[in-house]
Amino acid sequence: MTYQHQYLDGTRIHFPLGKVVCVGRNYAEHAKELNNPVPTEPLLFIKPGSCVVPLDDSFSIPAERGAVHYEAEIAVLIGKPLSKTPDAEEVLDAISGFAPALDLTLRELQDQLKAKSYPWEVAKSFDGACVLAAFVPGDAVEDLSDIGIRLSLNGEVRQDGNSRDMLNPILPLIQHICGHFSLQPGDVI
């Protein structure tokens, strides 16, 4: 199955699928839930584009590899190159869209890797580990500090969050990321 960025109306977004920059423990409540310390700066890791699948297709959860943890996330699609330390206006101008995403983790494998002080990307980067819905155009979102995200499973709400609860808000977070490496059109935060 081939993934292609698209807007809610079905219009294809002609950016190549790039990297997926993820932020671990960006919500204090989630860090506490996992008995992890709340980080003092963004905890960044990257998923390869090969792990992305569209939400509208069926996707498989590799239960044979152990417990699979899921988290609803707010995905931000980058539409213009960003590097070094862009100002907030440049970052806002480079945002092409927002979408709900599902971040899947092989939790048992991640715990084993962490216990050995090994990198744990393989527990978060398997094929299908990043499920992306269609994007809402960036300029359609008026308040980046009030984007809701909810995950229900069989009618039961499992997660109900909002961007206002982020330890690192969207624009400063993207600025921080650009201080470490460039973002290109098609990259997803």
Model-derived features: where do they sit?
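Extended, compositionally biased flexible segments
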Residues: 1-96, 101, 108
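Catalytic-pocket segment enriched in acidic/His residues
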Residues: 2-14, 26, 30, 36-38, ...
